[in-house]
Amino acid sequence: MKDELNKVVIYTDGACSGNPGPGGWGAILLFDKNERTICGNNPDTTNNRMELTAVIEALKFLKVAYNVDLYTDSIYVKDGITLWIEKWKINGWRTASKLPVKNLELWLELDSLASFHNVTWYWVKAHAGNLYNQKADILARSQISK
């Protein structure tokens, strides 16, 4: 069934002025022949929360299941969803240091959304010339002062 799903490529980014402070997020969704941008802000947040929010909002935008290639410049998001989350679940949402997982409500939402879609996760180096990562970065930063 997963092979029959439509495909979308998503680039996400989050930004924050101060940490914590006002923040913004942006996502570029590349469908077969269309490009869609979405963005938003939060007056009091952290960079990691904005990175997670960008991914969550991009996946929420998709109303049916998709094959998703998702690109993030956040190692926190990429490693969290691909390496850490299963261990967190086993450990009662505690880290390897036995501390509560930060941003738990966002991780729970992301886990649910990611399981609805068929997501392949990619890390892309920030500010390294990737066009769509740069577009997502510009979107995210543009939302900080709104």
Swiss-Prot record:
Cofactor(s), names only, from the UniProt record: Mg(2+)
EC number: 3.1.26.4
Subcellular location(s) per record: Cytoplasm
Molecular function per GO: magnesium ion binding; nucleic acid binding; RNA-DNA hybrid ribonuclease activity
GO biological process terms, semicolon-separated: DNA replication, removal of RNA primer
Enzyme class: hydrolase
Domain RNase H type-1: 4-145
UniProt keyword Acetylation present: no
Binding site for Mg(2+) 1: 13, 51, 73
Keyword annotations from UniProtKB, A to Z: Cytoplasm, Endonuclease, Hydrolase, Magnesium, Metal-binding, Nuclease
Pfam families listed in its UniProt record: RNase_H
GO cellular component term of the entry, any: cytoplasm
Binding site for Mg(2+) 2: 13, 137
UniProt catalytic activity: Endonucleolytic cleavage to 5'-phosphomonoester
Family: Belongs to the RNase H family.
Functional description taken from the UniProt entry: Endonuclease that specifically degrades the RNA of RNA-DNA hybrids.
Subunit structure: Monomer.
Designated name of the protein: Ribonuclease H
Origin species: Ehrlichia canis (strain Jake)
Taxonomic path: Bacteria, Pseudomonadati, Pseudomonadota, Alphaproteobacteria, Rickettsiales
Gene name of this polypeptide: rnhA
